[in-house]
Amino acid sequence: MSVIRVTDLDLKGKRVFIRADLNVPVKDGKVTSDARISASMGTIDYCLKQGGKVMVTSHLGRPEEGVWSEENSLKPVADNISERLGKPARLIKDWVDGNFDVAEGELVILENCRFNKGEKKNADETAQKYAKLCDVFVMDAFGTAHRAEASTYGIAKYAPVACAGILLTEELDALTKALLNPARPMVAIVGGSKVSTKLTVLESLSEKVDQLVVGGGIANTFLKAAGQNVGKSLCEDDLVPIAKMLMEKMAKRNATIPIAVDVVVGKKFDASEPAVLKNADAVTDDDMIFDIGPKSARELSDIIMKAGTVVWNGPVGVFEFDQFGEGTKTIAMAIADTDAFTLAGGGDTIAAIQKYDIYDRVSYISTAGGAFLEFLEGKKLPAVEILEQRAAGSR
């Protein structure tokens, strides 16, 4: 990734505009989970220490454009950052036309960028106004890098200098290492309820990986494609032919999609539903598959332990209910123990990592959802592409 990095620049006395991803959950005016703020502080602290006049903005929620609302205000975020810095970080409400000053080594929070007209549509006029506020634009919001908006793309076109922040650089380096130059064997684990929502990811990965592990509802469609009864389990019958095609395509190049040999079933989706272990060929018409069995989990664990690279996106069972969580737990522990480079991303995956307490034992955890998936699909991320173009133009 040939982009200018913020750490390559002299920021002293410069007006620095950071687009971060501070879209955090808020309840009763307080931030309830500040992982994204923590992840963004590296870039913010760096720019402050370098003597920049630092402005940071983000979206929060989905407000109506052009209308300020308390529920989508960045005030709780500004309070959280002020506490971290031990000094106030001013929240500036109407900032698009300037009308505010920032001192060297000071941080101001620019109110939710989605309150601004033209933000979502990437309006040129809005982007140019943003660009006039700064000498250096720092894109650090990997979570929105797949969207071309005024604060992620437009400003990068017009700012005097456009660069990548520390978090964005780390994300891109980790994804590049895992997907573009992977150590072999390469294993991808893709879970989730539906093949249809991850179809392009599965198709793209099926051409790259040595083993493509499918989990959750997705695995049921592949089980059916392998000729097994899946009972009343979540399964997309219309995509069974595509599952077969992916299995055949991978087999032709000696790669595999491992199919479960045993499963854990119940009769209904309920936290108190008893778990029943069955061989995969013994599922009855009224069963619902909620997890893989211990034999299948051991097989997958062995695959992970022998891997050079593991990409994890999605659990392999209904791990929210402990009786259907053993498969995901086994996989999580193998990912923690393997010598492979491990990359994980997606909300459910991060929830599993937290539940099984392996956060510090995964090589890299991506904070992004949609952008992570689009990178896995092999798509170009617009906000990264524009940084590459600006870097090429500055040589």
Swiss-Prot record:
<feature type="binding site">
    <location>
        <position position="198"/>
    </location>
    <ligand>
        <name>ATP</name>
    </ligand>
</feature>
<dbReference type="GO" id="GO:0004618">
    <property type="term" value="F:phosphoglycerate kinase activity"/>
</dbReference>
<keyword id="KW-0324">Glycolysis</keyword>
<feature type="binding site">
    <location>
        <position position="147"/>
    </location>
    <ligand>
        <name>substrate</name>
    </ligand>
</feature>
<protein>
    <recommendedName>
        <fullName>Phosphoglycerate kinase</fullName>
        <ecNumber>2.7.2.3</ecNumber>
    </recommendedName>
</protein>
<feature type="binding site">
    <location>
        <begin position="59"/>
        <end position="62"/>
    </location>
    <ligand>
        <name>substrate</name>
    </ligand>
</feature>
<keyword id="KW-0547">Nucleotide-binding</keyword>
<feature type="binding site">
    <location>
        <begin position="21"/>
        <end position="23"/>
    </location>
    <ligand>
        <name>substrate</name>
    </ligand>
</feature>
<dbReference type="InterPro" id="IPR015911">
    <property type="entry name" value="Phosphoglycerate_kinase_CS"/>
</dbReference>
<comment type="similarity">
    <text>Belongs to the phosphoglycerate kinase family.</text>
</comment>
<dbReference type="InterPro" id="IPR036043">
    <property type="entry name" value="Phosphoglycerate_kinase_sf"/>
</dbReference>
<feature type="binding site">
    <location>
        <position position="114"/>
    </location>
    <ligand>
        <name>substrate</name>
    </ligand>
</feature>
<comment type="pathway">
    <text>Carbohydrate degradation; glycolysis; pyruvate from D-glyceraldehyde 3-phosphate: step 2/5.</text>
</comment>
<dbReference type="Pfam" id="PF00162">
    <property type="entry name" value="PGK"/>
</dbReference>
<keyword id="KW-0067">ATP-binding</keyword>
<feature type="binding site">
    <location>
        <position position="320"/>
    </location>
    <ligand>
        <name>ATP</name>
    </ligand>
</feature>
<dbReference type="GO" id="GO:0005829">
    <property type="term" value="C:cytosol"/>
</dbReference>
<keyword id="KW-0808">Transferase</keyword>
<feature type="binding site">
    <location>
        <position position="36"/>
    </location>
    <ligand>
        <name>substrate</name>
    </ligand>
</feature>
<dbReference type="GO" id="GO:0006094">
    <property type="term" value="P:gluconeogenesis"/>
</dbReference>
<dbReference type="InterPro" id="IPR015824">
    <property type="entry name" value="Phosphoglycerate_kinase_N"/>
</dbReference>
<dbReference type="GO" id="GO:0006096">
    <property type="term" value="P:glycolytic process"/>
</dbReference>
<keyword id="KW-0963">Cytoplasm</keyword>
<dbReference type="GO" id="GO:0005524">
    <property type="term" value="F:ATP binding"/>
</dbReference>
<feature type="binding site">
    <location>
        <begin position="346"/>
        <end position="349"/>
    </location>
    <ligand>
        <name>ATP</name>
    </ligand>
</feature>
<comment type="subunit">
    <text>Monomer.</text>
</comment>
<dbReference type="GO" id="GO:0043531">
    <property type="term" value="F:ADP binding"/>
</dbReference>
<keyword id="KW-0418">Kinase</keyword>
<dbReference type="InterPro" id="IPR001576">
    <property type="entry name" value="Phosphoglycerate_kinase"/>
</dbReference>
